[in-house]
Swiss-Prot record:
Signal peptide: none annotated. Keywords: Cell membrane, Membrane, Transmembrane, Transmembrane helix. The chain crosses the membrane at residues 5-22, 26-45, 52-74. One of its GO terms (cellular component) is plasma membrane. This is Uncharacterized protein RC0131. InterPro entries: DUF5510. It is a multi-pass membrane protein. It is found in: Cell membrane.
Amino acid sequence: MFKNLLCIIIFLGINLNVYAINSSSYTTDDIIKIVIILGIVILIFSPAKFRIIVIGTMLGLSCAYFTYKYIVPIFISLLNGP
């Protein structure tokens, strides 16, 4: 498991260097894709008890993200008024 995760971390480091050479940076969409891929890899190589914790954490973080991205701006716009 750790060998596979180490390969993925090295791959992400190479990608980060390529982004730095091209003088661009990760966007939010890139980071979300990386987190999803890492979550899937961790789920594949993790034991059953740990898998339940990871699934719960991923669900909680995704709910928090969508709340922050979609619901909070609605309340902010309501506070600002028409």
